[in-house]
Amino acid sequence: VETSIGTLNFTDGVPSRDTADKVYDFMDTSRAAEAFLQGMPAASLAALIEGAHSLGAVEAHQVMLFDNLMNAKSLFLTGNSATVYVVPDLDLKRDGPTVVDAPDGLLGAANDGCFRFITNLGLAGKYLFLPPGYEGDVPEGYTVFRPKTYRVWVFLRKTPKNKSPEVVAQAAQEIREGLKVYRLADAANPPAMEWISGTDEAFNTIHYNNAEFYHHMNKVIQYEALGLLTPGVRGLFASLGIEKGKPFNPDDRMKAILADGVAIGNAQARSIVWYPRIDKNMAGAQIYPDTGSAWNMAYMGRNVHFNGEDGATMNTDARVTFHYPYTAVTPAMAAPREGTGSDYAIAFLDGDKKPFDGSKTYKITLPKDAPIANFWAVTIYDTQT
């Protein structure tokens, strides 16, 4: 039988040993590529947390704050230089039930360890996050959430009226005075908050894009609850030797296959992002459909769960289109309601459907009378980071 991987030989339907070996190489390589795409959300969130930890924001009350805005020294998949970001992360395995006491005036949300939306934190209040399987007492006075994972990433931002140093400093100070993060066990006497500045710091929050990705995912899987991944995705990683409670020691053959698989997975992700198949499963990607415009939505069809029109069919390409270049999941980022909502338009190609070239000059034409209540920004990102 002639195929794209060569000639496959059978006798009475039984494959030859050489054919079986060839097929297994194909199976393992394709599974490695798919594992890269399926594991990307978890790897990306873990990398965000590890980036903050590298600056010293390790304990619950140690929180990274971009007190003088973000700049290109810090490697983030997304972010802008117009808002003051503060990004607590919670470790419910280490700390048990944990409280985020949020003030008024912040916008943001909490995501679990696989970048699934948990809740918005747009209103002042005490948000209590319980570990998976928690059966202890739950005190009154909290808004309670039970994420599927031990790790929870919280992203909050405050928008200063302008970017003058005084106004930005005031916004950062209001965050310092209002936001508290602590273990529920310390609720009677929470430790003083420690603010770690992320501004002008060179550190990385982007997940691995080489074969180290699989070792990183093994570390995440070993630490996390089973709810991190679906049974099917857990099985996918197990087929590569990555399974909770077991060592991951790929032999030379598998090392070569993983290196090949992650390279193919990267190529898949970049192809999906730059050239979405809008005539097929990415038909809802365009901001201006039927116009030939290159502007696309961050969330295909403004669906932050990527679960299709019926709410039950996962669009894996739509999920890759978001998680490969972006971070932070909340319905509020795909709700263009005038006066209260927000929306994002992304262009990976110019008006002629060609990749942007840093040696050329481009012009953006904005729609007339676009509704802007809080702020708007145009942000340029590096195609590699």
Give residue spans per PLM region.
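A compositional/structural signature for long, glycine/proline-rich flexible linkers
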Residues: 1-385
